[in-house]
Amino acid sequence: MKATKLVLGAVILGSTLLAGCSSNAKIDQLSSDVQTLNAKVDQLSNDVNAMRSDVQAAKDDAARANQRLDNMATKYRK
């Protein structure tokens, strides 16, 4: 995430440095691209956070299932 923001910052810095050599249309296009990329990064970050909770829930379910299996196995031992 930090690396992505660093890259985006470099793109913004590069576009401002090239402002003297570029047209306003090109600068506007680059700014639009940066905004689009920022939105995608935010969406991916939200998706990752949602997956973390799903993964934790799956781990908890697996632990409970393993515990039940362990309890069943101890009941059948002679």
Swiss-Prot record:
Coiled coil residues, start to end: 27-75
PROSITE patterns according to UniProt: PROKAR_LIPOPROTEIN
Membrane topology: Lipid-anchor; Peptidoglycan-anchor
Protein's recorded name: Major outer membrane lipoprotein Lpp
Further remark: About one-third of Lpp is covalently bound to peptidoglycan.
N6-murein peptidoglycan lysine: residues carrying this PTM: K78
Reported effect, Y76 to F/H/I/L: Does not affect the formation of murein-bound lipoprotein
Job of this protein: An outer membrane lipoprotein that controls the distance between the inner and outer membranes; adding residues to Lpp increases the width of the periplasm. The only protein known to be covalently linked to the peptidoglycan network (PGN). Also non-covalently binds the PGN. The link between the cell outer membrane and PGN contributes to the maintenance of the structural and functional integrity of the cell envelope, and maintains the correct distance between the PGN and the outer membrane.
InterPro entries the UniProt entry points to: Lipoprotein_leucine-zipper_dom (IPR006817), MOM_Lpp (IPR016367)
Naturally occurring in which organism (per UniProt): Escherichia coli (strain K12)
